[in-house]
């Protein structure tokens, strides 16, 4: 009798220690994890793609292999068409296989050339603007292709716009002052301002 009571008390203590979760119970349910954001290689690849879209030099480098391949295809199709036309003129049987159209290959080649020309023009314009910005506003401005490369002495873009507007207003004031001085030297009177109804 005493042994059975000890065995029952041991079973009760084991159940109380293990708890409802380990004795076949459901236990606390885990909350569903939110979907993970793009991190690591996926995010870096997306950022690199955006930089390539913005940077005309990177775009130019990407188009060069395509241009080489298009030129090789164009020369190959031109040779095939020339051989076929020569065989037809000589009364010989031409190849039965389909031959690509020369005009479509030439159009694709010219389209790539136009894209390369636009990239070069855009790169030249960006270089000119960068030189003018460095000349008239020595403070650096973060670019769209490298937004993270912000230096401590860089100028925010809204403040940069304010500086440019102030420079434009100053240039207009200088132009007006020089024009007034030239009119005074030559003795010419400036033209009276005109309103909507004519001369005031």
Curated annotation (Swiss-Prot):
> What is the organism of origin for this protein?
Bos taurus (Bovine)
Q: What is this protein called?
A: Mediator of RNA polymerase II transcription subunit 29
**GO terms for molecular function, please?**
transcription coregulator activity
Q: Where is this region: Disordered?
A: 1-48
Q: Which Pfam families match?
A: Med29
Record GO biological process:
regulation of transcription by RNA polymerase II
Mainly resides where?
Answer: nucleus
The record's comment on protein family reads:
Belongs to the Mediator complex subunit 29 family.
Lineage of producing organism: Eukaryota, Metazoa, Chordata, Craniata, Vertebrata
Keywords attached to this Swiss-Prot or TrEMBL record, sorted alphabetically, are: Acetylation, Nucleus, Transcription, Transcription regulation
Q: What would be the name of the gene that encodes this protein?
A: MED29
List modified residues, type N-acetylalanine. Answer: 2
Q: For this UniProt entry, what's an example GO CC term? A: mediator complex
Q: Where in the cell is it found?
A: Nucleus
Q: Which domain of life is it from?
A: Eukaryota
Described purpose of this protein according to its UniProt entry:
Component of the mediator complex, a complex that can either repress or activate transcription. Mediator complexes are essential for basal and regulated expression of nearly all RNA polymerase II-dependent genes. They may act as a bridge, conveying regulatory information from enhancers and other control elements to the promoter.
Feature: compositional bias, Low complexity: 1-20, 36-48
| Subunit description | Component of the TRAP/SMCC mediator complex. Interacts with MED20/TRFP. Associates with the MED18-MED20 heteromer.
